[in-house]
């Protein structure tokens, strides 16, 4: 870590702020998929790309609408963000996390079942008016499987 002591402290404070931002995102998702709360953590023009599993949403409001729909299908979720790597460069940053998420989601017949999601997040963030916000997220689902089947069968 190079730079003055003040720059190094600022970088550490930024890393902690980004970590807390991600945890707020996860908490809003775990609290009934609070779309308004999640959107408040994003730039208005944010992009959220969930690939084939969840699609690409351009703009925070579009993502908020998708979150509301997901919330209708997932009645319980515990978003566990793990193994973060956060790199800060001035007012921009990149954060990477693994997601382990046990949840209760509707199956193809519309019945609730215990499921697992294993995925990765690759976030680009910007600092605006002293606040870190998500600007671009790639959400890469590795598996979304029924608990009883396990991920080896999915």
Language model features: what each stretch is:
Residues 1-4, 8, 21, 46-50, ...:
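A near-ubiquitous, low-amplitude feature marking generic local secondary-structure context
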Residues 3-6, 72-154:
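A beta-strand edge to alpha-helix "cap/lid" segment located at domain peripheries
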Residues 8, 12, 54-57, 112:
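Charge-dense, low-complexity intrinsically disordered segments
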Residues 14, 30-31, 45, 49, ...:
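Acidic side chains
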Residues 34-101:
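A solvent-exposed, acidic/Ser-Thr-rich amphipathic alpha-helical stretch
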